[in-house]
Amino acid sequence: MKKIAMGLLIFILSVPSLASSGVGIVKDEDFRAVGVSQENIDKVKTIITEASTQYKLKTLDKKALEIEINKYILDGTEKNLDKLNELVEKVGIVDAEIIKDRLKYQIEVQKYISTDQYLKARELSLEKLTKTQQKQ
């Protein structure tokens, strides 16, 4: 069950942008078909948008730290070792914050759409995609 929940979280957070009428490949109608209210779907979309924004910001912070690390490496690793160690610690903190955020947003999403509902809705979407591809 933990693997399914983590898979759900990774899928949801890896979606760079929301579809206009769904979450990733799963459409609103598929969520409604498995018993999720439109209000809950809208709340999940809001959570995912916030999660995506936070992830992008923290990723930018991490990249900025990595650029600074590279600058100090080019300037001389040995003489900048203390500063490099400090920056590496900061990168670790940002990585930990990203993981904590994923867990936080997963908990928030599961308040509105259960793992079972998501998996059933996803299966409906995949069936529709398969039928559409077979027609072409």
Where are these regions (language model features)?
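Residue-level detector of intrinsically disordered/flexible regions characterized by low predicted structural confidence
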Residues: 4-5, 47, 133
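Short, low-complexity, Pro/Ser/Thr/Gly-rich segments in the mature regions of secreted, periplasmic
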Residues: 119-136
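Sec-dependent N-terminal signal peptides
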Residues: 4-16
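Boundary of Sec targeting at the N-terminus
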Residues: 20-21
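Long amphipathic alpha-helical coiled-coil segments
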Residues: 107-123
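Amphipathic alpha-helical segments
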Residues: 29-112
